[in-house]
């Protein structure tokens, strides 16, 4: 059986000509016959001339507007400037003596560090004509329905928001995220309208303007609520009411520095409660404003400048009228740049942060309440009701959980800090008294030792004289006894005229010797325990032995005087 011979597979065409040949199209267009060939050839030749490179270039050159002249002139100027720069640089660095590489680099680093440390944003310095009133009485509200009413004293809402954010010391990434949301136009509108609504509510009530502002506040809050991404809504709106309350409070402090006494703790409590209830429908915890880091606003602006104290400013303004023109003191410069002015001790002490201390009592009374965690924002409900949006139910099923709430605060009582301070003060007073009494006891012991030494020396001298002349010994001894009696009498008179505390602390009489151990024992039990008590007992024994030695010496002297008198009588007889 014969096998079929394999057929050769035809290769695909590799070029356009091979493709035409494989399709039997290689004869086209050779077989095309055109009438009036001369006319077609002439037309084809003209067409080739019209679409040539030279013709197209010449046409574009004449008809298309060119900007190359401007570019050429700019390039020529840049080349000229580059040449001048190189020439100037060559003149600067032609000598190596003019530069020091090490010193240049060190100075550069030092200058960069200096600029980084003292860099501050540019601030708008208001002239005297632009200065406005800095108290509540001199401020008025002008409602603008189609635009926001500007804050007093040309304040910028963005700067106030940034100041509040920086006080929280947020991380850089978190700061950038919240910054984009809190500096949005609807958040700025909330700050403006909330500030003016609270200004009218607290100081200059106007029902019509307040209602208009409240409508706009609701619209701004709904717009902000819809713009925040869903994944950030919960976290953002947990912190935003507190941030807005701080921003409004900061605006009041910056707008009316002369009325800062009105912005007390009650003002902050009412402001925060109102904003929290508007935005979330829940009241914050009592004393929520204690964590605000805005204590320095009374003495420092949001830009870091020191405020001129009100009393000092009034004094300067009153003295300005009596200042002569020859004195080179510029009051305006001092008022515009008060950084060099000293801060009053009262204001600096008020800026110190005080830690809260609890009362020494049983604490507040508590009770259980139902906490509704399905509450809604009154602003959003008001917005829905105002626009009468259909198909949206504003009612909800109450869901809640019991939690503990304070029923009654404890009555005022000494706090633990006050008790600790009082105990420390008493301990310091006792320590001072102990040191004073201890020093007095040491002085008394030293005095007794010196007196004992004097008595011993006097007795030795009398014993030495006894062997020489009995009459002289008798006279000297009588003089010595008379001297001791006079000193004892003077001391008794002095003790009678002295205060009871001094008579108790004296060690010259038996009563003082009995009272001083009790006093020393009290101080020893407070400060040093048994060791000081042992020392006081040793001191008592020493004092007792000293007095006994004095008594023995007195008895010996009496015996010697009797012996001397008897010997003198016998010799005389």
Curated annotation (Swiss-Prot):
Which stretches does the entry tag as region Disordered? 497-528
Q: Which UniProt keywords apply?
A: Coiled coil
Q: Where is the composition biased (Low complexity)?
A: 497-521
Q: Which residues form a coiled coil?
A: 429-485
Q: Which family, according to UniProt?
A: Belongs to the FAM227 family.
> What's the protein name?
Protein FAM227B
Native organism is Rattus norvegicus
Lineage runs: Eukaryota, Metazoa, Chordata, Craniata, Vertebrata
